[in-house]
């Protein structure tokens, strides 16, 4: 493991912000910490990167691990240009290649606005520059704390396409916090946190299959005997005289059932379970 957090907690007076959390991140994987605002995500990240000390517990890195961090709030100078900001930051690291700044400007698509002052950039442009700053020294482990908060859907997608590409090319380990549940769909490992505790963990597929319900809605040509439908082993609920809602455990089960009753079907809809469904099932509320 490139990083392990063993039974870490953080207390502020009588308030327990993080409660006995255990995390493990394998080298080269994409990891997500999900949860509503106030769940303890940012406090956890702050402990992992050393900005805050745990009240109890232990954080263990592989020896020699280099980390990069994209903070919620930028640490760059708004009055300097993109290139000036990156050049000044690059001087803080020893042994960087002379063309490192230019290389990142090209790879992250910053060329068109590299001479603009950072403070004049759009939200998406600033995020790209923030990511470039975090990558200057070639980190083994990249932390991103709510990196796309406040950005529109198209900009969020472009940022995530970039991050997935960089993660594959660089072989980095990535750890992000977010309350946009769709951003974790490709993650190798997800930790869902609420009230400072890990309430579920696993791959996106594992969590969705365990906590999210698939919905198969069928309108039959004629009224059906609900007992005969229940005998097939799926949960079923009658919505109207001809409409029934089933909860197949998998897409395969839905397809097999549709094949069995295809001659009786007037119309059907299938909606696979989502991370939003899983989150609501786990926390009892939508992410906020």
Locate the predicted segments by residue.
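Helix-to-loop junction immediately C-terminal to a conserved catalytic motif
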Residues: 49
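Conserved ABC ATPase "signature" region
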Residues: 87, 98-113
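Conserved ABC ATPase signature
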Residues: 117-121
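Catalytic Walker B motif of ABC-type/P-loop ATPase nucleotide-binding domains
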Residues: 142-145
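ABC transporter nucleotide-binding domain
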Residues: 162-245
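Short, charged/small-residue-rich alpha-helical element at the C-terminal edge
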Residues: 216-288
């Amino acid at each position: 493991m490139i990083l392990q957090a063993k039974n870490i907690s953080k207390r502020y007076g009588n308030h327990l912000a993080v409660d006995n959390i255990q995390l493990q991140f394998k080298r080269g994987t994409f990891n997500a910490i999900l949860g509503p605002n106030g769940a303890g995500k940012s406090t956890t990240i702050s402990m992992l990167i050393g900005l805050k000390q745990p009240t109890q517990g232990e954080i263990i890195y592989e020896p020699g691990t280099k980390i990069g961090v994209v903070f919620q709030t930028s640490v760059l100078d708004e009055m300097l240009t993109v290139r000036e900001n990156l050049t000044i930051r690059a001087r803080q690291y020893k042994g960087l290649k002379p063309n490192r700044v230019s290389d990142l400007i090209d790879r992250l698509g910053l060329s068109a606005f590299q001479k603009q002052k950072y403070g004049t950039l759009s939200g998406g442009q600033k995020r790209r520059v923030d990511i470039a700053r975090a990558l200057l020294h070639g980190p083994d482990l990249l932390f991103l704390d709510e990196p796309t908060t406040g950005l529109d859907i198209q900009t969020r997608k472009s940022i995530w396409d970039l991050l997935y590409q960089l993660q594959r090319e660089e072989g980095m380990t990535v750890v992000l916090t977010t309350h946009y549940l769709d951003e974790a769909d490709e993650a190798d490992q997800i930790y869902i946190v609420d009230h400072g505790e890990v309430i579920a963990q696993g791959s996106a597929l594992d969590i969705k299959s365990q906590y999210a319900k698939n919905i198969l809605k069928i309108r039959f040509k004629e009224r059906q005997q609900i007992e005969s439908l229940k005998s097939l082993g799926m949960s079923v609920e009658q919505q109207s005289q001809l409409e029934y809602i089933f909860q197949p455990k998998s897409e395969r089960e839905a397809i097999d059932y549709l094949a069995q009753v295809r001659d009786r079907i007037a119309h059907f809809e299938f909606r696979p379970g989502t991370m939003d469904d899983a989150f609501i099932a786990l926390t009892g509320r939508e992410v906020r």
